[in-house]
Amino acid sequence: MGGIRLDTKQLKQDIIDYAYTIGIDSIGFTTADPFDELKQKLEAYHANGYASGFEESDIALRTEPKLSLPTARSIIAIAVGYPNKLKGAPKSVRGDRRGLFARASWGQDYHTIMRKRLDMLAAFIESKVPDVEIKSMVDTGVLSDRAVAERAGLGFVGRNGFVINPKLGTWTYLGEMLVSIPFEPDDPLLDSCGDCTICVDRCPTSALVGNGQLNSQKCISFLTQTKGYMPDQYRYKIGNRLYGCDTCQQVCPKNRGINTEQDDIILEPEILKPRLVPLLRMSNKEFKQTYGHLAGAWRGKKPIQRNAILALAHFNEVDAIPELKKVATTDERPLIRATAYWAIGQILGEEARDFINANYDQEDAEVQNEMIKGLDTRRE
């Protein structure tokens, strides 16, 4: 770097000090060496069919940092705490049932929040070392945010698969940057969950398979983001969740008493815990205007509306029947019509048979299947 000897120890401290002034709550440093242990875990993860399909499928890219930045010498990991308490949250009552977005999607999309901080941190480093090479990543990058954070000393990976930070708990957004500067690495945090298995025991779908591993195919957070039919065995498991699931974090003892607020995370109770029936009426434009700033909107309105219909069935919400009938008979999307017919059958039982029979012949096979299923597999 220009042939000038760089005081990396002082620069590291300067970076740490600056990070805390721009809304970064925890920062750590590690090498750019391969994540060999992670490679073995990912190979088993894919072999067992646990992958969600949302993450980078190339294991080499996920575990070898220098494939992303050949000049990388270090990785700087950052964590930003996010709030988990919603002040003034409206109540969900009969006739006015509400859904819920997971806490990681509260406020402005966290990708935007994290990129802003990483860009500011990168600019600071570049002001000190103009010829430095940097590559930043947040969530959708190829590296494993959790593996990087753990090795950089931000926390340890708990049985729920989340990095548990001593001050922030699991309620954190994670990001990292590869840099061409050889910083002294921090030591990993020596801590563990001990004998605690509360998260494993309380997971609604038994998706936690031990040692911090997750079967994404059973995880409610993943299931709420899929665009197809919700598997039968999970339809009532999702409850009123519209996007994501926080159960394994809510029950974690390490999270007790923790609630981190950020100036740029503005909580809107009516949006984060919305009325279910009005949600079904939203056009694409209205959905984008209302929810487009949330991370939970990244898959579009169809999964959210499907989940809203399932939530109405979960609540056995008879007052929603007129709207569900309208959706079932007028919506252009087979998935949404089918889910609405299923929910009507679940809520009304035999009382729905005449309505379903009257519309049966005009539907295609996949919708007809859900119409029958709604009547014949009603939850008692």
Curated annotation (Swiss-Prot):
Binds 2 [4Fe-4S] clusters per monomer. It catalyses: epoxyqueuosine(34) in tRNA + AH2 = queuosine(34) in tRNA + A + H2O. Its main location: cytoplasm. The active site is at 139 (proton donor). Residues 181-213, 234-263 form the 4Fe-4S ferredoxin-type domain. Its cofactor is cob(II)alamin; [4Fe-4S] cluster. Its EC number is 1.17.99.6. One of its GO terms (biological process) is queuosine biosynthetic process. [4Fe-4S] cluster 1 binds at residues 193, 196, 199, 252. Pathway: tRNA modification; tRNA-queuosine biosynthesis. One of its GO terms (molecular function) is epoxyqueuosine reductase activity. The keyword 4Fe-4S applies. SUPFAM superfamilies: 4Fe-4S ferredoxins (SSF54862), ARM repeat (SSF48371). Keywords: 4Fe-4S, Cytoplasm, Iron, Iron-sulfur, Metal-binding, Oxidoreductase, Queuosine biosynthesis, Repeat, tRNA processing. One of its GO terms (cellular component) is cytoplasm. PROSITE patterns: 4FE4S_FER_1, 4FE4S_FER_2. It holds the Pfam family HEAT_2. [4Fe-4S] cluster 2 binds at residues 203, 219, 245, 248. It is found in: Cytoplasm. Belongs to the QueG family. Catalyzes the conversion of epoxyqueuosine (oQ) to queuosine (Q), which is a hypermodified base found in the wobble positions of tRNA(Asp), tRNA(Asn), tRNA(His) and tRNA(Tyr). Monomer. This is Epoxyqueuosine reductase.
